[in-house]
């Protein structure tokens, strides 16, 4: 282990001299596997745990999810932390916080207790995701980003598949309990974060990141897409899974099996989507995603209007998740239009924008859910249509000065 404890700094351009498993992209893959082991266990068990153990209703689950999104709204605080801690270290510390909070979740089966553990795990999750996006865009070249990000998504899905598969098998055949599942998922995430701290050097990017809040007018379309995506994502994360339990009575192993199918599909298709993104570009990829999501959410609405059954609902859940995996197209769009030194501060700002609606929307929609669950999905369909309109404003070849179709036309006219 002595050779693993070397924390020397390695310049990014010199990292190719390291063994492949110790290079920056390899670290991104390990972290991509570590995060879902805790988060996926938490997600898979949450709806059943809060209904069966904590006796939650739609209002409480809405409040819990709103509290969970507060650290995302405050992700801009990452910029302040980066004044005294490098991004790589902050990412690993955040993974430890996420894993530790998930590990102790079942010891606090009350509304108040779950608010506390959820807040801690959420700080870890959102700060990790903020830093992770920045590191991905700094460490992966523009040319390789679409396919590499596709493989990173597949790695995360594979880790989730393992976690979900063990939950299904353990619940059905070995009497797995909430306590053991949470301890195992959170504990492995902590262990992998410690491994990453010991095994990898500190990587030094030749382009220093700005340590201040960055808001640029020319990034407005990226900000708008982030806002709409955050609002829409909450409805899928909170209410689609909650519907499976409340309306169709899915048990732990059934709902987890559905998540398992989701991640299996992602493992197979995320690399393909990365290649498609490289071929068809961000505009066409995002148009495809949002058009598909508009149809999916409309059909969710139809479940309540026309009384359609569980098979359709489960199928939509899988398709829904598949479309959401295309979100890395927004990352590569920003990578193409941004100044290299803006990656870290803009990742923090973007996460805050992404979570503006996420803080209050679940709680408000929780009350709407009591009155009309179908209306929640009708609202989501409207958000997907709005995102579709925004994606049509992306030029075919986005770049600095050509961030939108309007800017691209001005550039062509000036030429």
PLM region spans:
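Helix-to-loop junctions at the C-terminal end of transmembrane segments
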Residues: 74-87, 171, 269-282, 369-370
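Glycine-rich segments within core transmembrane alpha-helices of 12-TM secondary carriers
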Residues: 149-165, 352-361
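C-terminal ends and interior cores of transmembrane alpha-helices
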Residues: 96-109, 292-306, 392
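C-terminal membrane-cytosol helix-exit motif in multi-pass small-molecule transporters
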Residues: 167-168, 186-205, 390-395
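C-terminal transmembrane helical hairpin of 12-TM major facilitator-type secondary transporters
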Residues: 284-327
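Intracellular juxtamembrane helix-capping segments at the cytosolic ends
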Residues: 127-140, 325-338
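Short amphipathic helix-loop junctions that connect adjacent transmembrane helices
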Residues: 44-59, 238-255
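Hydrophobic core of transmembrane alpha-helices in multi-pass small-molecule transporters
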Residues: 33, 101, 112-128, 310-325
């Amino acid at each position: 282990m002595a050779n693993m404890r070397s924390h020397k700094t390695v310049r990014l351009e010199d990292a190719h001299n390291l063994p492949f498993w110790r290079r920056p992209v390899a670290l991104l893959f390990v972290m991509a596997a570590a995060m879902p082991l805790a988060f996926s266990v938490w997600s898979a068990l949450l709806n059943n745990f809060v209904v069966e153990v904590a006796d939650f209703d739609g209002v409480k689950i809405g409040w819990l999810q709103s509290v969970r999104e507060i650290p995302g709204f405050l992700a801009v605080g990452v910029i302040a932390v980066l004044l005294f801690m490098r991004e790589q270290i902050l990412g690993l510390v955040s993974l430890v916080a996420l894993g530790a909070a998930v590990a102790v979740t079942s010891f606090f089966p009350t509304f108040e207790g779950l608010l506390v553990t959820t807040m801690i795990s959420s700080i870890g999750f959102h700060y990790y995701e903020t830093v992770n996006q920045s590191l991905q865009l700094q460490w992966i070249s523009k040319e390789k980003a679409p396919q590499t990000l596709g493989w990173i998504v597949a790695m995360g899905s594979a880790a989730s598949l393992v976690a979900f598969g063990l939950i299904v098998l353990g619940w059905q055949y070995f009497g797995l309990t909430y306590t053991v599942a949470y301890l195992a998922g959170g504990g492995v995430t902590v262990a992998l974060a410690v491994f990453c701290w010991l095994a990898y050097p500190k990587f030094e990017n030749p382009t220093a990141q700005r340590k201040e809040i960055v808001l640029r007018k020319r990034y407005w379309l990226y900000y708008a897409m982030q806002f709409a995506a955050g609002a829409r994502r909450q409805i899928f994360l909170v209410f689609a899974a909650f519907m499976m339990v409340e309306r169709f009575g899915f048990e732990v192993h059934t709902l987890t099996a559905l998540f398992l199918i989701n991640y299996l599909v992602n493992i197979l298709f995320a690399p393909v989507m990365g290649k498609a993104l490289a071929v068809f570009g961000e505009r066409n990829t995002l148009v495809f995603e949002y058009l598909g999501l508009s149809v999916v959410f409309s059909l969710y609405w139809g479940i309540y209007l026309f009384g359609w059954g569980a098979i359709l609902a489960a199928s939509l859940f899988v398709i829904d998740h598949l479309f959401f995996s295309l979100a890395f197209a927004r990352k590569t769009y920003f990578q193409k239009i941004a100044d290299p030194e803006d990656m870290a501060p803009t990742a923090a700002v973007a996460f805050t924008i992404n979570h503006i609606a996420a803080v209050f929307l679940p709680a408000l929609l929780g009350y709407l859910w009591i009155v009309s669950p179908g209306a929640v999905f009708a609202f989501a369909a409207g958000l997907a249509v709005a995102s579709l309109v925004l994606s049509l404003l992306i030029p075919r070849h986005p770049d600095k000065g050509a961030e939108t179709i309007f800017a691209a036309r001005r550039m062509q006219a000036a030429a």
